[in-house]
Amino acid sequence: RIIFELLKNSKISDRSLSKKLGVSQPTVTRRRMMLERTSIDNYTLVPKWDQLGYEIFAINFVKIKMEIATGEKDKSVRDRGIKWLMKQPNIIMAGASRGMGMDAFNISLHKSYADYDQWFGAFRSEMGDLVDDIQSVLVNLRGGEVIKPLNFKYISEGAT
């Protein structure tokens, strides 16, 4: 229950959380510290992306060339891909995936379509020799059509 309450509001004090859960403040502090060692990766905020100047939220799907993704080259290709991904500050999540004939995905944020287009061109230029196909879904963060903004509080609402 502590994690779900922290998903709703990670700024809540242990004292307020203890009152909400009906346990002592030292118990909450002890359990939270244990959860921070085992289950909580970090505390993060979810900003209003458009207010920070971001216009595009992109979900990018990648199909790796079959001959590259198998055999001896697999580790070096994977290492090269990971190194490239980690240098991209606008990519907020990436990993392997299954479905739609794609092998990997990444989620990126961009200040404008021109920024996205430049990033996409750099991706094709730097990683294109490893990729068969790239497909992107672009979400306009300023268009007024984001119905349910990204927020982790929804997970806690579904669990309680």
What are these model-derived regions, one by one?
Residues R1-T160:
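A compositional/biophysical signature of low hydrophobicity enriched in polar/charged and small residues
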